[in-house]
Curated annotation (Swiss-Prot):
InterPro entries: PRC_barrel-like_sf, PRC_RimM, RimM, RimM_N, RimM_N_sf, Transl_B-barrel_sf. It comes from Cupriavidus taiwanensis (strain DSM 17343 / BCRC 17206 / CCUG 44338 / CIP 107171 / LMG 19424 / R1). This is Ribosome maturation factor RimM. Keywords: Chaperone, Cytoplasm, Ribosome biogenesis, rRNA processing. Belongs to the RimM family. An accessory protein needed during the final step in the assembly of 30S ribosomal subunit, possibly for assembly of the head region. Essential for efficient processing of 16S rRNA. May be needed both before and after RbfA during the maturation of 16S rRNA. It has affinity for free ribosomal 30S subunits but not for 70S ribosomes. The PRC barrel domain binds ribosomal protein uS19. Disulfide bonds: none annotated. One of its GO terms (biological process) is rRNA processing. GO terms for molecular function: ribosome binding. GO terms for cellular component: cytoplasm; ribosome. The keyword Kinase does not apply. Binds ribosomal protein uS19.
Amino acid sequence: MNRPQGEPAKALRLPAALLYAEPLPEDLVEVGYVGAAYGIRGWIKVQPHADDASALLHARRWWLLSPPQAGLVAADAARSQPVCVKIAQSREHSGTVVAQAAGVADRNLAEALRGRRVWIRRADFPAPDEDEFYWVDLIGCNVSNEQGELLGEVSGLIDNGAHQILQVAFVQPDGKAGERLIPFVDAFLREVDTAGKRIVVDWGLDY
């Protein structure tokens, strides 16, 4: 039946089994977003935030959260409720990850999830190879040099295509915020202790 002209489309109500009412795990990390439905059987297509999608492919539970919206109204409250899905299968596909989630049985439900951010638990990440690190584990690490001088704290990372660069935040003598950009490469790295939140580099205060 055609909808009368001017009548707004009704939002699809998500099944109660998909809604997550418990407190969210404290170690959730955002790893991508649902870009579209994939096929007609409820598969979703996810655009990963990182080139390496191994964490997405490894995790069997995804939390799908709506992005923050200005002026959220009561009518949108149900759509903003967290969704938790169990992943039956997933695979890489042309720079994305396509996945079949239990309880998402058709394209309409998959479309209703479009735009949601995909979060997974840090505990569900696969173990990194030796001398490899996840960005999320580097954030918040104190950075010092071999002379014991504190250079600041890792606030972010940049990928320039050739290598990663640590964004190290510090307070300048005048009290203003400063930032050091230190290449995350063997030439400058001396020690990385993610458990102790500590990184030692060959880098001077005046660089």
